[in-house]
Swiss-Prot record:
GO CC annotations on file: cytosol; endoplasmic reticulum; nucleus
Amino acid composition bias (Basic residues), ranges on this chain: 511-524
Domain of life of the organism encoding this protein: Eukaryota
Polar residues biased stretches: 495-510
Keywords: Endoplasmic reticulum, Nucleus
GO molecular function: cysteine-type deubiquitinase activity
Protein name according to UniProt: Inactive ubiquitin carboxyl-terminal hydrolase 17-like protein 8
Length: 530
C-alpha cells in the first residue's frame, strides 16, 4: 500500500536493491540458451470467428492460429507476493493479473519464446517469462520484480496501473516481431500476444437513403467502458453497442449515393478475444479525480449480445482477475488486485501480502480493470491441472520455501542467472521509454472533425468499403517529469514505433483517456465488391 507520503521525494527505490541478495531468474540480465524448440503442444480447436482474415490477406503469419499451449504448466497453488520498491503498487497489481492469465502463463512456462529469442538487448517476453516462472514457483514467499519491467515507465511516483498494463502488453507484442520488422499491420495482428488478448471491432454504417453499407474493422487489445451513466458492466456494454443515429448536422456523407443522408452507426465485436480486458473509465480526463461509484460486474459474462454474428449460442467468459484502485484521484491512493489461482481459490494480492478471500469479496470492489477468460479456455486449463499435467507437482515442501536456483534451472533450463551486468545498468535508453511509447499514441488520436465510419469517394453501387482509419498527427507538450526516466534500464527495443499502438492509452496530458470505448490502432484498407 502507498499514498502521497510514500513518494520519498521522487526517489526510485529500486536503487537500493541494485545488488540482489538471492539468486533469481532475472530475464532482463539472463543469458538465454539458444536451444531447439520443443515439440509443439496441442493447439486449441475452438475459435469464434476468423481474426479478420476475411478482411484482407495476411502477408506473413507470425504465429499459427490458436497456437496456445493446451495443457497447463502452472502450479495449482497461488504463488509469491511482490515487494513494493517505492510507489510501485501499480506495477505489482498489474503483474499479478498478468501472471495469473492462464494462456499467457502457460506460454511463458513452455519456454518457446526464450529458446528462439534473437533480441540482443532486453526483451519483455524473456523478462516476463522469468518473472512469471519465479512468481508461480515461489508460494508463501515475497519476491522482487525485475527493474527491467519498469524501465522507461516509472518516474519515481505512482503511475496509472492500466497504462503500465498496456505498456507491458504492447512491449510483449513487439517482442514477437524480431526478424519481421517490415510486416504489414494485418500480419502484426497474428502475434501470440494478439491471439491471447486481441479481437476485432466492426463499425458498420448503413445509409438510410440508398441502404449502402460501410464496414470498418479495427483490432483491439482492451475495451474501455464509460460508466458515467451505467450501474453495471452489462449496461456499459449495451451503451457501447447501441446504434447511433446520424442526421441533421451529423448526417452521413454517403460515398454510394453521394448525398448527406441520415444513417445508423452500429459498433459490434467482430471477433472475440480469448482473454477480455475491460477498463472502467473511473478518472476524469481533466482533473484526474476518480468516479467512485459501485459498478456491478458478474463472475460470468455472456458477450454474445455484443457480437456481430448473432444466434450462435452463448459466448461465456469467467472472471479470473480484478485490479482495484483505492483512493480519490489517479495521482494518489494505491492499487491491489484479486486473482483466481489454478485450483479455483481467489486471493487478494496486496504487494507482499497474499490472502485467501471469497468470491463475494471479489465482486464487491470498485474495480478499475476486469480480466475475463473464455469459459471453455478456463475449463481446459483447470482440467489439465486436475490430471496432473504440470511439469512439476508442488508437494508440501513447496509451500515452505521458494523454488531454488537449481530447481528453476532444472525445470527451465533456458534460464541462466549471471551476476548483474553493470554496462546494462549504465546503458542509455535508446530503447523504448514512456515518452517514446506515448508519442505514436498522440499521433494516432483521431481528428475531431473526422468520422472513422465515413466512406469517402464516389463508388459504384453494391460495394463494401473497408477503409483506412485516419488519425491526428499532432503531439501535446510533454510534462517536465516525463523528459527522462529515473531508470536507465529499458525492457524493450524502440525500433518500429508504429507497432506500439495498443489499448485505451493515456496521452501526455496527465491521465486523459480516449472518449471512445474501443481502441483504434489499425491501418487497413480494402475494397470488396459484392
Amino acid at each position: 500500500m502507498e499514498d502521497d507520503s510514500l513518494y520519498l521525494g521522487g526517489e526510485w527505490q529500486f536503487n537500493h536493491f541494485s545488488k540482489l541478495t538471492s539468486p533469481r531468474p532475472d530475464a532482463a540480465f539472463a543469458e538465454i540458451q539458444r536451444t531447439s524448440l520443443p515439440e509443439k503442444s496441442p493447439l486449441s480447436s475452438e475459435t469464434r470467428v476468423d481474426l479478420c482474415d476475411d478482411l484482407a490477406p495476411v502477408a506473413r503469419q507470425l504465429a499459427p492460429r490458436e497456437k496456445l499451449p493446451l495443457s497447463s504448466r502452472r502450479p495449482a497453488a497461488v504463488g509469491a507476493g511482490l515487494q513494493n520498491m517505492g510507489n510501485t503498487c501499480y506495477l505489482n497489481a498489474s503483474l499479478q493479473c498478468l501472471t495469473y492469465t492462464p494462456p499467457l502463463a502457460n506460454y511463458m512456462l513452455s519456454r518457446e519464446h526464450s529458446q528462439t529469442c534473437q533480441r540482443p538487448k532486453c526483451c519483455m517476453l524473456c523478462t516476463m517469462q522469468a518473472h512469471i516462472t519465479w512468481a508461480l514457483h515461489s508460494p508463501g514467499h515475497v519476491i522482487q520484480p525485475s527493474q527491467a519491467l519498469a524501465a522507461g515507465f516509472h518516474r519515481g511516483k505512482q503511475e496509472d496501473a492500466h497504462e503500465f498494463l498496456m505498456f507491458t502488453v504492447d512491449a510483449m507484442k513487439k517482442a514477437c516481431l524480431p526478424g519481421h520488422k517490415q510486416v504489414d499491420h494485418h500480419s502484426k495482428d497474428t502475434t501470440l500476444i494478439h491471439q491471447i488478448f486481441g479481437g476485432c471491432w466492426r463499425s458498420q454504417i448503413k445509409c438510410l437513403h440508398c441502404h449502402g453499407i460501410s464496414d470498418t474493422f479495427d483490432p483491439y487489445l482492451d475495451i474501455a467502458l464509460d460508466i458515467q451513466a451505467a450501474q453495471s458492466v452489462k449496461q456499459a456494454l449495451e451503451q457501447l453497442v447501441k446504434p447511433e443515429e446520424l442526421n441533421g448536422e451529423n448526417a452521413y456523407p454517403c460515398g454510394l449515393c453521394l448525398q448527406r443522408a441520415p444513417a445508423s452507426n452500429t459498433l459490434t465485436l467482430h471477433t472475440s478475444a480469448k482473454v477480455l480486458i475491460l477498463v472502467l473509465k473511473r478518472f476524469c480526463d481533466v482533473t484526474g479525480n476518480k468516479l467512485a461509484k459501485n459498478v456491478q460486474y458478474p463472475e460470468c459474462l455472456d458477450m454474445q449480445p455484443y457480437m456481430s454474428q448473432q444466434n450462435t449460442g452463448p459466448l461465456v467468459y469467467v472472471l479470473y482477475a480484478v485490479l482495484v484502485h483505492a483512493g480519490w484521484s489517479c495521482h494518489n491512493g494505491y492499487y491491489f488486485s484479486y486473482v483466481k489461482a489454478q485450483e479455483g481459490q481467489w486471493y487478494k494480492m496486496d504487494d507482499a501480502e497474499v490472502t485467501a478471500c471469497s468470491i463475494t469479496s471479489v465482486l464487491s470492489q470498485q474495480a478499475y480493470v476486469l480480466f475475463y477468460i473464455q469459459k471453455s479456455e478456463w475449463e481446459r486449463h483447470s482440467e489439465s491441472v486436475s490430471r496432473g499435467r504440470e511439469p512439476r507437482a508442488l508437494g508440501a515442501e513447496d509451500t515452505d520455501r521458494p523454488a531454488t536456483q537449481g530447481e528453476l534451472k532444472r525445470d527451465h533450463p533456458c534460464l541462466q542467472v549471471p551476476e548483474l551486468d553493470e554496462h546494462l545498468v549504465e546503458r542509455a535508453t535508446e530503447e523504448s521509454t514512456l515518452d517514446h511509447w506515448k508519442f505514436p499514441q498522440e499521433q494516432n488520436k483521431m481528428k475531431p472533425e473526422f468520422n472513422v465510419r465515413k466512406v469517402e469517394g464516389t463508388l459504384p453501387p453494391n460495394v463494401l468499403v473497408i477503409h483506412q482509419s485516419k488519425y491526428k498527427c499532432g503531439m501535446k507538450n510533454h510534462h517536465p517529469e516525463q523528459q527522462s526516466s529515473l531508470l536507465n534500464l529499458s525492457s524493450m527495443n524502440s525500433t518500429d514505433q508504429e507497432s506500439m499502438n495498443t489499448g485505451t492509452l493515456a496521452s501526455l496530458q496527465g491521465r486523459t483517456r480516449r472518449s471512445k470505448g474501443k481502441n483504434k490502432h489499425s491501418k487497413r484498407s480494402l475494397l470488396v465488391c459484392q
